[in-house]
């Protein structure tokens, strides 16, 4: 599968664009919930623009023996979730909407704690058929960019950031097909 690289500058600009759309909407979050680990940095950048506190959840597709699982499961959840989430407007953040199963899982878990409202923000929404479904309770979905179905390489996953950024530069030099 072809790769698509994003730099920290790309991520920052995309998160800023999302924050502007959140502010222009009728949704005003009380808290940001980051899905770890990909949603941590986007959530932190959104906090800069929205000024809201961040909570984090951990979700995995691997069992205790590092074997892949069909569906996601919780590895870390919000301490005192009922107290922190009930009646709140939550902005759920992840880096990419690929299969949508992680988003669906987290939304359903959050709904158990009776929030006033949940909105979703993702940096990138892959243009492909999704396995998961966003529950109808979610009225706002903010995607920074809609991208083709390629392997996305984020800077926080790079072991050599200069090599990563060079790959991004090379991709931008290739004419669009």
Q: What is each stretch, according to the model?
A:
Residues 31, 55, 91, 119-121:
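A structural signal for isolated positions on well-ordered beta-strands in alpha/beta enzyme cores
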Residues 52-90, 100-105:
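Short, glycine/charge-rich flexible loops or terminal/linker lids adjacent to PRPP-binding catalytic cores
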Residues 27-36:
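Short glycine-rich phosphate-binding loop at a beta-alpha junction
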Residues 1-28:
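Active-site-facing substrate-recognition patch
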Residues 49-50, 137:
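Short, structured coil segments at secondary-structure junctions
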Residues 2, 108-177:
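PRPP-dependent phosphoribosyltransferase catalytic core
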Residues 24-28, 83-86, 113-114:
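Glycine-rich phosphate-binding loop signature in dinucleotide/nucleotide-binding domains
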């Amino acid at each position: 599968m072809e790769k698509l690289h994003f730099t920290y500058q790309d991520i920052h600009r995309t998160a800023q664009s999302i924050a502007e759309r959140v502010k222009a909407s009728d949704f005003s979050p009380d808290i940001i919930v980051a899905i770890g680990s990909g949603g941590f940095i986007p959530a932190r950048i959104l906090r800069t623009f929205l000024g809201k506190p961040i909570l984090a959840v951990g979700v995995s597709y691997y069992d205790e023996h590092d074997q892949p699982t069909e569906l996601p499961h919780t590895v870390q959840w919000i301490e005192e979730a009922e107290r922190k989430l009930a009646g709140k407007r939550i902005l759920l953040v992840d880096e990419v909407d690929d299969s949508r199963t992680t988003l669906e899982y987290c939304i359903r878990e959050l709904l158990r704690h009776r929030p006033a409202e949940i909105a979703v923000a993702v940096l990138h929404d892959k243009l492909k058929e999704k396995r998961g479904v966003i529950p109808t309770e979610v009225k706002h979905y903010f995607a920074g960019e809609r991208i083709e179905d390629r392997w996305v390489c984020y800077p926080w996953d790079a072991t050599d950031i200069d090599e990563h950024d060079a790959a991004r530069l090379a991709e931008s030099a290739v004419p669009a097909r």
